[in-house]
């Protein structure tokens, strides 16, 4: 009997029930149960086992005898990775596997746009299909717990609602277009240092309300097809064999019907992993190959367990039409439609932190622009450890400005300004490096500074493009601090003495210390690792073609010690003398030593990010949700009404400026008489609104009452607390000019 894969459509939408999100629409993964039962009945035990581990670096096997195609995985949540050799990390060097470099996760989150998240998933799906892929290894949706996190650039935000809504729409965008997603990294992979062996100790409430929430939303509201188990341990158990996380919560409570795969090299056992909920070991068969076959034949693992894992795989396989191998990689991947999506995300992600009048650039006054900084010309599609994109092209900030002012009387000149920090320079120099080479580096750095100063003196405007790069922010290790590398603080001070008219552009993925930049810049923008079209988007914002509309997806602290985990002394943990990383060792073909031990104490509990700063009255440098505009917005006429199972928050938003622009309105809720410990306020709704100059709109943001529940650790379930609630509305977590009170009495009873 031959079986063909079927094309299915995801059901868009969803509702909330019993204080957690759910989807009452049909789940495409459960539409072929009888057919799957028949397929499993035809399979041998060996064929079943062969599906449960990596066939090569980025695929797991199907069953050729039954015409069941392999599942092909697409690495990289912000662009489809180049094709690799079957059993190594070496590139195949094809001419057709370039891809669009989409803005990274923190950039997408800075759009605060569910529409952009959907388009992002759609764009990723289109390119994955051209490459013959079935499942995107993304989105990466771990909460940004620490400012120094190595993968903060890849993750979304510090807030579970913002991360969850974006994850839901990314998932829908991809799966509506016949490409599965794999949510990662489940769960509590919130640091890179020691991630391969660290044991996370977290309260049940914090785990449920903060860290699991984005995963739960994407599973329940978008029927995510895949989940990747994280490297770390939670409460003493590896995530890849964690019965509580994988069986009880993910499948038992949330109703997940897809596949659970290990992170690469992140499987630690055969029997425990098989019984603990792991479906696929990647990228090899160390535990789920012959060892698993032997366990089944010995009666240690029931064949029914194997059948259920195969069922999970076949559900995904039948929901996602396979691309015939002869059609994959036959044309260049990046297409104009995806490039346009990359531009739209980038242009909406740019955050204006400060503006003293230099922006937008006034070409009546500005004729000579000095662009200074290595990041003005540096490509960010690759670098460091982990996923990168073989981008067909990447418009740098300098190229974007040159194109924007091409054919005008504005002259643009460039100076490097500083030597970039490379991976090798982050470690102690080896003894073979001579004093003369150190002297050469110092002399070159000083020469670059003097060239930058000279150029600044001649210019009407200085655009300093600094920040981090992908060598500084990288998988496998967290940053030691949030100080700008390469002596950028000293450089900006020297430039300011030569020319005070400075616009600073920070190309970053995570928070940095901007105190010196703030003091020496008239205007500051955050432009992120912003993809193939990042330079064009930045130039359009600088020139005033569009108004900046991004909002910070995380808090910028004044100093690192203000952030919760650092303040409480629970991060960084004491590292082994020679710390190892499971992924880095896998790439280097070196055996990972999992016997190393460390604990991560989440002592801040639910007080992550802005929840901490607001509750502890610690002023940040720039708050969560902050972002200015070239327009001016006015909030007024707030009303809040309970409407059946939701709170409808209505207000008027006016653009009283002279430029068309977009604003992200944010709704926070305070519970002033709560019997439990709560943050000063929590984000419960947001909406991006486009307004023409002088335009006014009535805005309504609906908040499901279930979203106001908290996790009761005594009852081990969601609980709705009655009593007063203060609704706060504004443009950031610290700028909330409107507030009103409602009474939540006899309005909702959890099922």
Question: Where do the PLM segments sit?
Answer:
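Bacterial N-terminal signal peptides that target proteins for export
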Residues: 1-6
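Bacterial N-terminal signal peptides
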Residues: 7-15
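Glycoside hydrolase catalytic-domain context in secreted enzymes
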Residues: 16-713, 717-734, 749-750
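Short beta-strand elements
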Residues: 735-751
């Amino acid at each position: 009997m031959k079986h063909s894969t079927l094309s299915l459509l995801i059901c868009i939408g969803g509702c909330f029930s019993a204080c957690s999100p759910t989807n009452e629409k049909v789940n495409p993964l459960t539409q072929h149960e009888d057919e799957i039962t028949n397929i499993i009945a035809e399979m041998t035990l060996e064929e079943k086992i062969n599906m449960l581990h990596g066939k090569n670096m980025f695929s797991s096997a199907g069953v050729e005898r039954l015409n069941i195609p392999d599942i092909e995985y697409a690495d990289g949540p912000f662009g489809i990775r180049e094709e690799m050799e079957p059993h190594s990390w070496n590139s195949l060097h094809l001419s057709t596997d370039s891809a669009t470099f989409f803005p990274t996760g923190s950039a997408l989150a800075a759009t605060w746009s569910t529409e952009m998240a959907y388009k992002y998933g759609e764009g990723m799906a289109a390119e994955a299909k051209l490459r013959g892929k079935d499942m995107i290894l993304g989105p990466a949706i771990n909460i940004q717990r620490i400012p120094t996190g190595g993968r903060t650039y890849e993750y979304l935000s510090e807030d579970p609602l913002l991360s969850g809504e974006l994850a839901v729409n990314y998932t829908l965008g991809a799966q509506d277009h016949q490409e599965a997603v794999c949510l990662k990294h489940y769960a509590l992979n919130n640091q890179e240092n020691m991630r391969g062996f660290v044991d996370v100790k977290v309260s049940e409430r914090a785990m449920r309300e903060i860290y699991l929430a984005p995963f739960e939303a994407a599973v329940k509201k978008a029927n995510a097809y895949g989940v990747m188990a994280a490297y770390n341990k939670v409460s003493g158990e590896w995530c890849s064999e964690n019965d509580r996380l994988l069986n009880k919560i993910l499948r038992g409570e949330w109703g997940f019907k897809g596949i659970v795969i290990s992170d690469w090299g992140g499987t630690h056992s055969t029997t425990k992993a098989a019984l603990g909920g792991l479906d696929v070991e990647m990228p090899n068969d160390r535990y789920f190959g012959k060892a698993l076959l032997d366990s089944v034949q010995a009666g240690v693992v029931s064949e029914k367990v194997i059948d259920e894992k195969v069922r999970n795989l076949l559900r995904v396989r039948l929901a996602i039409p396979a691309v015939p191998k002869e059609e994959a990689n036959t044309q260049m991947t990046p297409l104009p439609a995806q490039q346009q999506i990359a531009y739209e995300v980038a242009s909406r992600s740019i955050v204006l932190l400060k503006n003293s009048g230099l922006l937008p650039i006034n070409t009546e006054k500005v004729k000579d622009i000095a662009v200074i900084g290595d990041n003005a010309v540096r490509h960010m599609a690759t670098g460091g450890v982990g996923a990168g994109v073989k981008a067909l092209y990447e418009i740098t900030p300098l190229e974007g400005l040159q194109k924007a002012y091409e054919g005008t009387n504005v002259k643009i000149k460039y100076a490097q300004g500083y030597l970039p920090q490379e991976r090798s320079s982050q470690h102690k120099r080896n003894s073979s490096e001579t004093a003369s080479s150190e002297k050469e580096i110092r002399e070159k750095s000083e020469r670059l500074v003097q060239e930058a100063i000279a150029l600044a003196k001649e210019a009407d405007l200085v655009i300093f493009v600094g920040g981090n790069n992908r060598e500084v922010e990288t998988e496998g290790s967290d940053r030691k601090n949030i100080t700008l590398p390469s002596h950028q603080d000293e450089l900006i001070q020297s430039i300011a003495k030569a020319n005070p008219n400075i616009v600073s552009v920070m190309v970053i993925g995570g928070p940095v210390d901007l105190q010196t930049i703030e003091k020496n810049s008239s205007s500051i923008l955050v432009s992120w690792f912003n993809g193939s079209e990042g330079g064009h988007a930045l130039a359009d914002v600088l020139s005033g073609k569009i108004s900046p509309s991004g909002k910070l997806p995380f808090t910028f602290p004044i100093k690192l010690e203000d952030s919760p985990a650092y303040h409480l002394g629970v991060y960084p943990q004491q590292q082994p003398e020679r710390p190892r990383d499971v992924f880095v060792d896998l790439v280097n073909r070196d055996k990972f030593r999992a016997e190393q031990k460390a604990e991560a104490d989440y002592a801040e509990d639910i007080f992550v990010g802005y929840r901490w700063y607001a509750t502890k009255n610690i002023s940040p440098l720039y708050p969560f949700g902050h972002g200015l505009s070239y327009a001016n917005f006015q909030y007024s006429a707030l009303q809040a009404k309970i409407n059946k199972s939701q709170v409808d928050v209505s207000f008027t938003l006016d653009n009283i400026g002279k430029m068309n622009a977009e604003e992200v309105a944010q709704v926070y809720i305070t519970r002033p008489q709560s019997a439990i410990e709560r943050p000063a306020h929590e984000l419960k709704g947001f909406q991006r609104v486009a307004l023409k100059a002088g335009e006014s709109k009535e805005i309504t943001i609906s908040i499901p009452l279930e979203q106001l529940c908290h996790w009761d650790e005594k009852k081990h379930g969601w609980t709705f607390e009655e009593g007063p609630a203060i609704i706060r509305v504004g443009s950031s977590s610290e700028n909330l000019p409107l507030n009103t009170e409602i009474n939540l009495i006899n309005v909702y009873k959890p099922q």
